[in-house]
Amino acid sequence: NRRWARLAVFICSLFVGMGQIEAQETYHTQIYKPKRIKSLQVVQPDQTFTVPVISLGSGEQILINFDDLTPNYERYAYSVIHCDADWKKSSLNELEYMQGFQGLTIDDFANSFNTTTQYTNYQLLLPNDDVQLKVSGNYAVRIYHEDHPEETVLVACFSVAESEVGIEAEVTGNTLIDTYQRHQQVNFSVLKKNLNITHPQTDLKIRVVQNNRPDNVVRKIMPSGILSDRIVYENLRELIFPAGNEYRRMEFLSSKYNG
């Protein structure tokens, strides 16, 4: 039986007409002022270890949380940027992907209390009453000081999904490299539902991400099989990930038996 993989598998198939401009900045979650800004988190509220993905129109929100190592409130502002499948700014203008205003300040903050180092914690929830998202895709939130908008303080990235296709996936220790040792194999199928996928090699943009890590994203994945109702990606060498000790299986079996 197949199970949903704990390894995040993102199917970026709906970036139609969102052009990519060469030499554009590639966005990823990053602190640009590391001596001052700490503890950046981009999560769903009350779900610290989840991948930052919400469903379009579901009422779900993304929480952007960070600390500033100063005791005073700073007027941090934010802008929301719609990105393509490669996390570059898409060709959509603001009116097409959001309803609301850019450059609003982050007013949800709290000062530290009885701590060795004084700091101020800031929180931003998106979407909110001032900013609504109209389309699915990848989003980058650029945060900067209101008095210095040209200087980026941090970038927080998340995705908004639509259930246009289904995904069945599994992670197994039985790989082409070894069996239940140091690697894991990801297999998955894209269920077409009612979506017309004529040429999956070009119609689908697949990204496989291990534990939300930006450093080993697998791209340009070709299917191993094309069926009437699904596109299959199985036993592909590029979908084998080093697992290490954290993902090894342990067998609690005794070697002692009664004679």
Q: Where are each of the predicted segments found?
A:
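Bacterial Sec-dependent N-terminal signal peptides
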Residues: 1-25
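Aromatic sugar-binding surface patches on proteins
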Residues: 105-108, 113-127, 227-253
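Low-complexity, Pro/Ser/Thr- and charge-rich linker/hinge segments at domain boundaries
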Residues: 26, 31, 160-183
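Ligand-binding face of N-terminal immunoglobulin V-set domains in extracellular IgSF glycoproteins
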Residues: 118-146
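Contiguous beta-strand segments within globular domains
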Residues: 33-82, 178-192
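Short, aromatic- and glycine-rich surface loops/edge beta-strands on solvent-exposed regions
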Residues: 78-80, 137-144, 238-259
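Extended low-complexity, serine/threonine- and proline-enriched intrinsically disordered segments
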Residues: 72-100, 198-221
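Short beta-strand elements
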Residues: 149-169, 259
